[in-house]
Amino acid sequence: RDILAREFEQKYGAKLLMIYAWPSQQLFCNLGDKSIKSYPLSKLKGKKIRTYSTTLGDFIEGVGGSAVTIAFAEVVPALQKGVADCGLTGILPAYNAKWWQVVTHNIRVKLGYASSFLAMNLKVWNGLDSDTKAFFNKHLADLEEEMWAATAKNDEIGTKCNAAGPCPKGEPGGMVPIIPTAEDKATLKNVVENFVLKRWAKRCGTQKCVDEWNETIGKISGMKASL
């Protein structure tokens, strides 16, 4: 977080105030047959998969799929018409947007949490008095904690609502859940290290950037980025 705060200030002239996230990003596929109960990540090879970010696109290409950028509002007709075979989005947003009407399976590989942030113009922040800064810091920290708790709750709700329920938001979606196997987890680690992280490190561009990632997120995740 300290590294992000520094980059916000130096690159964008902004004060980072909050980091929060949307529900976990997962795969939703139209496999055509709900009797399918297992589906390894290796079978995604050749599939057209909706994405919305470079990093997720790297993952899709890493498993042999074809990344297709489609606006969220256009995903349902794209899945319905076969423009895409699968889509990536948050597990509760997928339910709310009725993806369950056009897909059969939810592959429960968590590919991140669509991180978001709240920031303020740094000059404006620096112009505030100490009491106002303290007010923002306290209440935004409280709000951030509440939002992370809400994300966890929404993950739980989305997991149930997309499958057989019970669903507090309406009709259960009836998707067939695909639970990652040990083989899938090994595939995921390989793809992250050899596609996602390698390409990210190249975009990041400096050894300092890569080293800072390795010293923070890398230590927690047990993975290492390299240029």
Residue ranges, per PLM feature:
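A gly/proline- and charged-residue-enriched helix-loop-helix capping module
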Residues: 1-11
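N-terminal secretory/targeting leader peptides
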Residues: 10, 14-227
